[in-house]
Amino acid sequence: MRVLDEIAESPFLISPLNPNSTANGYRWVDKCHGFLHNTVLVAASLFFVAYLAYEAKKSLSKLSNRRSYIMIAYYGCLWLVSLLNLAWCCLQGWECTPGKEVVWNLLTLFTTSGMLFLEVSLVAFLFQGNYASGAEALTRTFLISGFIVALDLLLKAIFLFGFGVPLFIDNNENGKTFKWGLWIIHKLLLTGVYGMVFLMYNSRWREKLPARPAFYNYIIIMFALYSLYLVASAFTANNAHFGFWLYGIMSVCYHALYLPLLYITFLADFFQEEDLNLENVYYSEMKDAGFFDSDWE
């Protein structure tokens, strides 16, 4: 335990929130968690939004060709959540700015709820087997996701604004044990869900899930992420500095890398398949027009 605490206190690693940093005249990028923490978050989220914007015209064209209701809705949700996440990453200084507690809590609440909605939607989609494009499949997926996320958001709002539990502000020591107990339960539930899907992929029930390596790798990554989140929450609840440091690392990884991972897992294959379909169409049209007749002579 002592070795872990020494690692967590290293000046080269992401530091815990410093409530006095706003009084030192630092720039916004240095506030609260430090330069490294904020720079990684802003750079990663900004790069991903820029990539989405760069590919937007091509992506919208492919979505309109396939007319998949699920993909169109999911792509729109991804854009909305990506912009929310970018705002959250850029406004890290609000976490330790007096008078910004309420607006920071609201921003964090809606950002994390949006990301959780994408997570739950993808898991719900996995249980439907292959790609579905009907309005019924879209409605069923989003109803399940919406109900779970609405319940999660409601409970967090009650603890935040009803009981004053500082779920998203780490420099407030009031209710610390209770706060981290809530996070342990939250991460335990998510770890359990991904663990269950992982076991299904390695059992006779795997035939009910999409036979795509990308989905399997996604489940492994998310299971590992929430397992580490759970360990970090348990350490922090027991006043171990290592736990707080590890939780910060996992938070950076989640907000910086989750949305790109989701895009690669769920949407990139869809767009790639559309390219292959278009190539097959072009090939068929050229073959019908006699472009390849000389090859048979």
Curated annotation (Swiss-Prot):
Protein's recorded name: Protein CANDIDATE G-PROTEIN COUPLED RECEPTOR 8
Alphabetical keyword list: G-protein coupled receptor, Glycoprotein, Membrane, Receptor, Transducer, Transmembrane, Transmembrane helix
Q: How does it sit in the membrane?
A: Multi-pass membrane protein
- Which organism is the protein's source? Arabidopsis thaliana
Q: What gene name is given for the protein in this entry?
A: CAND8
Record carries keyword Membrane = yes
Give the family per the record: Belongs to the UPF0359 family.
Q: What GO CC terms are in its UniProt record?
A: membrane
What does the UniProt record say this protein does? G-protein coupled receptor. Plays a role in plants and microbes interactions.
